[in-house]
């Protein structure tokens, strides 16, 4: 029979109606001769009642054979429940079954289909189709669908044009490693799966599309963590003739629309703006979490005269004050934080506690002469804990920024119901790579430099600033963008500053440089990480929880066993040969 409605949508207004439902058996309970079934579908759970006095012996026998995850079809009359279940939207009603058909049976599942399961991640991914039956996973993916629907409606209203760009593109330097695809037709040549549609969307501006968007898959072969996947989805935007402020206004409107339509939250516009240098100085991060205080304090000048060379001779001395936390952290706890500090390049972690108005701790004796000045500078009160890092400014900022976030989580200082958006602006154009031994683009080589610093492309690259902007939510980079270079000579200077010879630049980006000969308009854009955005809206800590079929931390799929080996014939067609791993040769 045709399904009347979803099981999770049956309500009191349906009492007395005969309906047909289809779904999965969640639980079966036998009580006093009656059989109760929790029928589950994507919209929720509905209680079924099979009464032996009201159904045939055949229906009763079928009901007695049901097990968890059997797929069934039932017909019956909706009735009011004697004892309502306030925990379920359908809790005021039940279905008195008159007909029952088993559409399919099921083996015992490797884990229970319920929220809060204890199965490990690889087991969940191995049986992802079962994991996705769980209500919280269904809700996460329904939320994702609502977000993309809201985004599309908003951008369509603003006359953005949805254009698909190629997945088989050219490998270019800069950024993370590419995923390469060998060409069978052009032997020895490779496509790259795009890390973003950056260049193609810029070319669409040159083509006159004016406003482009795409919700698009991107690919990066990089080390994974909780907010990264090898394939991910971004909301990609590009516009012509708009200023940095206008692009940010459009983005804020998009965020506000999504927040209202999916979470019922009215966000305050415009979002705060923080300069990159200020974000690093105050929060120790270029993606600051502003849901709590504990700002970094610069004490370099305050401690200059102390008889403690670690402080007095350090390039920078910075500190954070953990208010009222002196009793929360033992010496052993602080030793653990010291190990964290070393991971960020710090040589150690100094500390003092304020006890009865006096400084206590390993370095307190060196600070007695400046206690009053220190107390004033840090607004110290009894029971405060002060953590110091003496090192380069970069190391001090990064270390204390990491400790700031860690401590806030440990002490429960973060309001998880808050959504604090902000812009980080006025970025450096380049960042130094120790691994490469050279300056590299902080964003990408197509970012427009601020006019007043562009002359440093032939001078001190550390002084070049970019017209770039990142949007941050609760300590996560939600997205980033910039105005782009549209003048050929400036783009060539940028490539040269990055160490490209004219020949290398032409080989890698000749098509873009050529396009700049044909009236390339001023343009700029932005991309928002959809997976990360939905993760934060859903209150999850890993983007795997909002992706239908993600990879694990080894970039593999336990369900399909991808990546896998392929037949020798396929490799021969591609003129490829796999070298045996040296470790395998000795086994």
Swiss-Prot record:
A biological process term (GO) from this entry: aspartyl-tRNA aminoacylation
Example GO molecular function: transferase activity
EC number: 6.1.1.12
Positions of region (Aspartate): 198-201
Cell location: Cytoplasm
Record CDD domains: AspRS_core (cd00777), EcAspRS_like_N (cd04317)
Alphabetically ordered keywords of this record: Aminoacyl-tRNA synthetase, ATP-binding, Cytoplasm, Ligase, Nucleotide-binding, Protein biosynthesis
Catalytic activity line of the entry: tRNA(Asp) + L-aspartate + ATP = L-aspartyl-tRNA(Asp) + AMP + diphosphate
Gene3D superfamilies: Bira Bifunctional Protein, Domain 2, GAD-like domain, Nucleic acid-binding proteins
Binding, L-aspartate: 174, 220, 443, 484
Top-level taxonomic group: Bacteria
Keyword Metal-binding: no
InterPro entries: Aa-tRNA-synt_II (IPR004364), aa-tRNA-synth_II (IPR006195), aa-tRNA-synth_II/BPL/LPL (IPR045864), Asp-tRNA-ligase_1 (IPR004524), Asp-tRNA-ligase_1_N (IPR047089), Asp/Asn-tRNA-synth_IIb (IPR002312), AspRS_core (IPR047090), GAD-like_sf (IPR004115)
PROSITE patterns: AA_TRNA_LIGASE_II (PS50862)
Main location (coarse class): cytoplasm
A GO CC annotation given for this chain: cytoplasm
One Pfam family hit: tRNA_anti-codon
Protein family membership: Belongs to the class-II aminoacyl-tRNA synthetase family. Type 1 subfamily.
Subunit structure: Homodimer.
Protein function: Catalyzes the attachment of L-aspartate to tRNA(Asp) in a two-step reaction: L-aspartate is first activated by ATP to form Asp-AMP and then transferred to the acceptor end of tRNA(Asp).
Name the record gives this protein: Aspartate--tRNA ligase
Organism this protein belongs to: Streptococcus pneumoniae (strain 70585)
């Amino acid at each position: 029979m045709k399904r009347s409605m979803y099981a999770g949508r049956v309500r009191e207004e349906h009492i007395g109606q005969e309906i047909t439902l289809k779904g999965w058996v969640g639980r079966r309970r036998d009580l006093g001769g009656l059989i109760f079934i929790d029928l589950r579908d994507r919209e929720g759970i509905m209680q079924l009642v099979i009464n032996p006095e009201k159904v045939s012996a055949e229906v009763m026998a079928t009901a007695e054979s049901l097990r968890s995850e059997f797929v069934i079809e039932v017909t019956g009359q909706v009735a009011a429940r004697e004892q309502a279940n306030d925990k379920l939207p359908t809790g005021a009603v039940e279905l008195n079954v008159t007909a029952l058909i088993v559409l399919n049976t099921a083996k015992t599942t490797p884990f229970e289909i319920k929220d809060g399961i204890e199965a490990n991640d690889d087991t969940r991914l191995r049986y992802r189709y079962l994991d996705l039956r769980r209500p919280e996973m269904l809700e996460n993916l329904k939320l994702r669908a609502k977000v993309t629907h809201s985004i599309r409606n908003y951008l369509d209203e603003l006359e953005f044009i949805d254009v698909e760009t190629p997945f088989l593109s050219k490998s270019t330097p800069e950024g993370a490693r590419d995923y390469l695809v060998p060409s069978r037709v052009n032997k020895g040549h490779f496509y790259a799966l795009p890390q973003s549609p950056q260049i193609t969307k810029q070319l669409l501006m040159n083509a006159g599309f004016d406003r482009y968007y795409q919700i698009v898959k991107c690919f990066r072969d990089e080390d994974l963590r909780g907010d990264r996947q090898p394939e991910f989805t971004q909301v990609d935007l590009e516009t012509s003739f708009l200023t940095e402020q206008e692009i940010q206004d459009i983005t804020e409107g998009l965020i506000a629309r999504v927040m209202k339509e999916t979470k019922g939250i009215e966000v305050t516009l415009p979002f705060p703006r923080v300069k990159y240098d200020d974000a690093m100085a105050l929060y120790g991060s270029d993606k600051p979490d502003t849901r709590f205080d504990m700002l970094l304090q610069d004490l370099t000048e305050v401690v200059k005269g102390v008889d403690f060379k670690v402080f007095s001779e350090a390039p920078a001395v910075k500190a954070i004050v953990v208010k009222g936390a002196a009793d929360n952290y033992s010496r052993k706890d602080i030793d653990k934080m010291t190990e964290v500090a070393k991971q960020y390049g710090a040589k150690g972690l100094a500390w003092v506690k304020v006890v009865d108005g006096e400084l206590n701790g390993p370095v307190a004796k060196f600070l007695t002469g400046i206690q009053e000045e220190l107390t004033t500078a840090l607004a110290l009160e009894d029971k405060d804990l002060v953590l110091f890092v003496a090192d380069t400014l970069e190391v001090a900022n990064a270390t204390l920024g990491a400790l700031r976030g860690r401590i806030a989580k440990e002490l429960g200082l973060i309001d998880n119901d808050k959504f604090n958006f902000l812009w980080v602006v006025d970025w450096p154009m380049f960042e130094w790579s120790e691994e490469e031994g050279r300056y590299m683009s902080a964003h990408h080589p197509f970012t427009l430099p601020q006019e007043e610093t562009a002359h440093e492309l032939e001078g001190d690259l550390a002084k070049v600033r970019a017209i770039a902007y990142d949007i941050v939510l609760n300590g996560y980079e939600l997205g980033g963008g910039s105005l782009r270079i549209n003048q050929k000579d400036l783009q060539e200077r940028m490539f040269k500053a990055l160490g490209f010879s004219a020949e290398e630049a032409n080989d890698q980006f000749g098509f873009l440089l050529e396009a700049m000969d044909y009236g390339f308009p001023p343009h700029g854009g932005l991309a928002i990480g959809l997976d990360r955005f939905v993760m934060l809206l859903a209150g999850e800590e890993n983007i795997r929880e909002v992706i239908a079929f993600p990879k694990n931390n080894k970039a593999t799929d336990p369900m399909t066993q991808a990546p896998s080996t392929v037949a020798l014939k396929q490799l021969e067609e591609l003129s490829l040969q796999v070298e045996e791993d040296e470790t395998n040769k000795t086994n």
